[in-house]
UniProtKB/Swiss-Prot annotation:
Record bears the keyword Transferase: no
Protein name stated in the entry: Anthranilate--CoA ligase
Catalyzed reactions: anthranilate + ATP + CoA = anthraniloyl-CoA + AMP + diphosphate
An annotated Gene Ontology molecular function: anthranilate-CoA ligase activity
Disruption-associated phenotype: Mutants show no detectable levels of 2,4-dihydroxyquinoline (DHQ) or other quinolines.
pH effect summary: Optimum pH is 8.5.
InterPro entries reported for this sequence: AMP-bd_C, AMP-bd_C_sf, AMP-binding_CS, AMP-dep_synth/lig_dom, ANL_N_sf
Keywords on record: ATP-binding, Ligase, Nucleotide-binding
Family label: Belongs to the ATP-dependent AMP-binding enzyme family.
GO annotation terms (biological process): secondary metabolite biosynthetic process
Organism: Pseudomonas aeruginosa (strain ATCC 15692 / DSM 22644 / CIP 104116 / JCM 14847 / LMG 12228 / 1C / PRS 101 / PAO1)
Binding of AMP, residues: 161-172
Self-association and partners: Monomer.
Length: 517
């Protein structure tokens, strides 16, 4: 695709019945024609307010209004970025400053940003209307119902931003173009899942998460399916309500959500025919629980820098403890610490990926940041090993590794050994603790599948006995802590940094004692 084009216009021209549903919201259904008319109307107003290339931060809950405003921004050549509406004020201000936003759109009760560089702020209407005008009528006058002046540009140019979750540092703005957006839509929605008109999609992850944005915002337009949008936070109770009322055929979740839905297995299984998990590796126990109930969960991994999922299990062929194969059009390879490609199976390395969803790069990137895209490959920072069949297994992240007495500790090796063979442990996380006299030592945090029948010391002894048979001694945990739940960020990803801080705090609070086991 070399001619100038506009992503919103391209999505509108896909050959689907305009009267079919595209979004479901608060018990109401919106057709493709209704949304298209509204987007064009809103674009005519935004064109009086914004110039092509202006950045717009959308800190809004999931709704048709958010999806339509996003596509209206792209229609006029503005560059929208959807962020978590629950972001702290400083985080929002930092993102607005980073992208030099001209406009911020927030929920009705959210304050305006202050300071000398504060952008114009619009607010959603109270009461959550089906389609919100965000006060544009009052600001720039009535809409032009005949507007069609799409801003067309190079298909490789940035047309929206996604900010990373910040799990590996400050959030970075990832640029996405028409070309790579259609690339990840085609690879995942069409080639992998074969989504089609009539499919009902429910993504529990929200649109501010790249995984959720593809599922809820883009795939309905791209595949002819329709999606449920929910402006409330996804508690297990709320998710159950949505499953019962909406009866989705395709469910997108993260491992923690599937774990929380175990008591509602009957309701989930009554309609869901295709379940997908991403965000963090799906534990073997979770895969096996749902498989025993007749539901195959396909695990996969994506990255904001690649738009969506690029490595996944195929429906009908999913395996436990496997992240699957590269999606059509993608290539993956593993490299060692020196950057040499690893050819042999069973050897661990850092995953590099290239393919149709690859981002053009970071917004205002430093040289160090942009180096992650060197040579047309994105360095994910994730550790994998590849088996003889070509399937990949996740082994953690390269920044999770640490040394004890000069020897590398691989946390996932310990974590998986525990979760596979000790059914009383639901989740396990190994992090380093800096001790006063002997440097870094491993600290283990666990959550339990069932309450302890005995004390924690006996649990620690069972863990030690099991690990001693298969794990090198320098990886054995020196402390054990049982938690009711593990900390996670807004995308459902494990917050290891919080656990490292907690481990240090607990160690220093309990000096001079060490756990005895």
């Amino acid at each position: 695709m070399s001619t100038l084009a506009n992503l919103t216009e391209v999505l509108f021209r896909l050959d689907f019945d305009p009267d079919t549903a595209v979004y479901h919201y608060r018990g109401q259904t919106l057709s493709r024609l209704q949304c298209r008319t509204y987007i064009l109307s809103q674009a005519s107003q935004l064109a009086r307010l914004l110039k092509p290339g202006d950045r717009v931060v959308l800190a809004l809950n999931d709704s048709p209004s958010l999806a339509c405003l996003f596509l209206a921004c792209i229609a006029v050549g503005a560059i929208p970025a959807v962020i978590n509406p629950k972001s702290r004020e400083q985080a929002l201000a930092d993102i607005a400053a980073d992208c030099q936003a001209s406009l911020v759109v927030r929920e009705a009760d959210a304050p305006s940003l202050s300071g000398p560089l504060a952008p114009l702020t619009l607010r959603a209407a109270a009461g959550r209307p089906l389609l919100d005008d965000f006060s544009l009528d009052a600001l720039v006058g009535p809409a032009d119902l005949d507007w069609s002046a799409f801003h067309r540009q190079d298909p490789a140019a940035a047309c929206f931003l996604q900010y990373t979750s910040g799990s590996t540092g400050a959030p970075k703005g990832v640029m996405h173009s028409l070309r790579n957006t259609l690339g990840f839509c085609r690879a995942f929605a069409t080639e992998l899942l074969a989504l089609q008109a009539g499919d009902r999609l429910y993504s529990i992850p929200k649109m501010f998460f790249g995984y959720g944005m593809g599922n809820s915002l883009f795939f309905p337009w791209f595949s002819g399916a329709s999606a449920l949008l929910d402006d409330t936070w996804p508690s297990p109770e709320r998710v159950l309500e949505n499953l019962v009322a909406f009866r989705p055929r395709v469910l997108f979740g993260v491992p923690a959500i599937y774990a929380s839905l175990r008591p509602q297995a009957r309701e989930l299984l009554s309609s869901v025919r295709l379940a997908f998990s991403a965000g963090s590796p799906l534990p073997r126990g979770e895969f096996e629980f749902w498989a025993a109930h007749g539901l195959e969960i396909c695990d996969g991994i994506g990255a904001t820098e690649v738009g969506h999922v690029f490595l996944a299990n195929r429906p009908g062929q999913a395996r436990a403890d496997s992240t699957g194969l590269p999606l059509p059009g993608y290539e993956c390879r593993l490299v060692d610490r020196e950057g040499h490609t690893i050819e042999e199976a069973g050897r661990q390395g850092v995953l590099l990926v290239r393919g149709p969803g690859l981002s053009p790069g970071y917004w205002r990137a430093s040289e160090e940041q942009q180096a992650r895209f060197a040579g047309g490959w994105y360095r994910t920072g994730d550790l994998f090993e590849r088996d003889e069949s070509g399937a990949y297994r996740h082994c953690g992240r390269e920044d999770d590794l640490f040394k004890v007495n000069g020897r590398w500790v691989v946390p996932t090796q310990v974590e998986q050994a525990i979760c596979r063979h000790l059914p009383e442990v639901s989740e396990a996380v190994l992090v380093p603790t800096c001790r006063l006299h002997d440097g870094l030592r491993p600290t283990l945090f666990v959550t339990l599948a069932t309450p302890l029948d005995d004390n924690q010391i006996l649990l620690a002894q069972r863990i030690d006995q099991h690990l001693a048979e298969q794990i090198p001694s320098h990886m054995l945990p020196s402390q054990l802590h049982v938690l009711p739940a593990l900390p996670r960020n807004d995308n459902g990803k494990l917050a290891r940094a919080e656990l490292r801080h907690l481990a240090d705090t607990l160690y220093h609070d309990n000096l001079p004692e060490e756990r005895a086991c």
